[in-house]
Amino acid sequence: MRCPKCQHNGTRVLDSRPSDESRSIKRRRECEKCLQRFTTYETVEERPLLIIKKDGMREEFSSDKMLRGLVRACEKRPVPLETLEKMVLDVERTLRNEGKQEVRSQDVGELVMERLAKIDDVAYVRFASVYRQFKDINVFIKELTELMNKN
């Protein structure tokens, strides 16, 4: 590793520890020449996960976008933000563990709804109404009936 101060190639690691929920390793280093200390982070390089939209367009997976949608569905509901953040991480982990580089948006939506139904019924119906694009009240009532039968 090259020293940022003197550009010398020789450095030694003084300390290593997990960082960012064990997604990276933080290392304290010291230059062997000028004794400058600095920090580096080592992370696994993840391949981008592409979402295939209904119209065939592709866009990179965005955990922020998913979280915004969940926050909107859970507005004025007793669902802690931390619960939603964990759900987003769980969905992303599930998608990445499948090993595919491209995933249909329908599959992502189903994973989200499956988890949201276990957390809050009202938020689930809100999310489903937008995600499944309910066209009329009959579709809405059908979804509510199915939800009530599950419970």
Curated annotation (Swiss-Prot):
Coiled coil: none annotated. The keyword ATP-binding applies. Signal peptide: none annotated. It comes from the Bacteria. Residues 14-24 have a biased composition (Basic and acidic residues). Binds 1 zinc ion. One of its GO terms (biological process) is negative regulation of DNA-templated transcription. Negatively regulates transcription of bacterial ribonucleotide reductase nrd genes and operons by binding to NrdR-boxes. This is Transcriptional repressor NrdR. The lineage of its organism: Bacteria, Bacillati, Bacillota, Bacilli, Bacillales. The gene is nrdR.
